[in-house]
Regions:
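Intrinsically disordered, low-complexity regulatory regions enriched in Ser/Pro/Gly/Thr
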Residues: 80, 105-112, 145
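Hydrophobic residues within the alpha-helices of tandem HEAT/HEAT-like
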Residues: 93-97, 120, 157
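Alpha-helical segment that forms one wall of the substrate-binding/catalytic cleft
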Residues: 89, 113, 152
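Short helix-interrupting loop/turn segments at helix-coil junctions
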Residues: 82-84, 120-128, 162
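Acidic, Ser/Thr/Pro-rich regulatory low-complexity segments at or just upstream of the first helical elements
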Residues: 1-84, 88, 92-102, 164-218
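Channel- or pocket-lining gating/hinge segments that regulate access to a cavity or pore
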Residues: 129-164, 168-175
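Short conserved catalytic/interaction loops centered on acidic-Pro-aromatic/His motifs
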Residues: 103-107, 123-138
Length: 218
C-alpha cells in the first residue's frame, strides 16, 4: 500500500525516532488500560454507563477476541507509529474520558485505542497511509472507521494539541508505572496486615516481609 504525505508536524513533541515495536512501553500501557477497565467495572453505575454507550459507533456488540496487548503490537507493527505517538494516543483517550460520559469498557477499548493512535499519527507525524490500509489493521470496514474518526473528533472537541510539559509529565507517569503499581500493591498488603496484625500474613507474602516487620516492630 502506497503512502501519502500528510500535514507537517504541528506539535513540540519529538516523534522522529525510528519506529519499532517497543514491548516495554506497550506492556506498561496494557497494564494501565487493564487497571482502568477493572476500576470502571467496579463503579456502582457501570451497567448504566454500558447501556448509555451501546448506541455509539465506538462501542462494539461483542468483545474482541484479540487481547489489547496483541492489538497494540499489531498497531505499532503495521503503522510503524513512534513511541511518543502511541503515548499521545493514550493521552487523547484520557481527554475524551475526562470531558465526556465515556468510560473504557471491553466493548469500546480496542476501537478507542486504534482511532486515538490513528489521530495521533495524523496530527503528529509526517506520513500516513490510505484509509483502506488502516481499516485492514483495525479489522473494521472503511466506512465504519470513518464514522469512528468523526465520532472521535467530536468527543475530543478538536483538542489535539499537547504541549511538551504536559507530554513529559504523562510520559514520566508511564515510565514509573511499575513503581506506582508496587506502591499501590504494598499499601494494599500493609492495610490488610494492620487489620490482621499477623506476622504469618507477611511470611506468606515474602515480597513485603522485610518492610512489614519493620512496621510491626516500630
Amino acid at each position: 500500500m502506497s503512502s501519502k504525505s500528510c500535514q507537517g508536524k504541528s506539535t513540540e513533541i519529538d516523534t522522529s525516532e525510528d519506529a519499532q515495536i517497543n514491548e516495554i512501553l506497550l506492556n506498561k500501557i496494557n497494564k494501565i488500560l487493564s487497571i482502568v477497565l477493572e476500576e470502571n467495572k467496579a463503579l456502582k453505575n457501570y451497567k448504566e454507563k454500558l447501556s448509555s454507550q451501546e448506541s455509539m459507533t465506538m462501542t462494539s456488540y461483542n468483545k474482541p477476541s484479540l487481547s489489547i496487548l496483541d492489538y497494540l503490537y499489531r498497531i505499532q507493527s503495521y503503522t510503524e507509529a513512534e513511541d511518543n505517538t502511541i503515548i499521545i494516543g493514550l493521552m487523547y483517550i484520557d481527554r475524551i474520558c475526562e470531558q465526556s460520559s465515556i468510560i473504557l469498557t471491553p466493548y469500546n477499548l480496542h476501537r478507542l485505542v486504534f482511532v486515538a493512535i490513528l489521530m495521533a499519527i495524523k496530527y503528529n507525524e509526517d506520513v500516513c497511509f490510505e484509509f483502506e490500509f488502516y481499516a485492514k489493521i483495525a479489522g473494521i470496514p472503511i466506512k465504519e472507521l470513518k464514522m469512528l474518526e468523526r465520532e472521535f473528533v467530536e468527543l475530543i472537541k478538536f483538542h489535539f494539541y499537547i504541549g511538551k510539559d504536559e507530554f513529559d509529565k504523562y510520559k514520566s507517569y508511564i515510565d514509573d508505572i511499575e513503581i506506582e503499581l508496587d506502591k499501590k500493591e504494598w499499601l494494599h498488603f500493609y492495610k490488610i496486615f494492620l487489620e490482621k496484625n499477623d506476622i504469618l500474613f507477611l511470611l506468606l507474602n515474602e515480597k513485603y516481609l522485610y518492610i512489614g516487620i519493620l512496621f510491626y516492630l516500630y
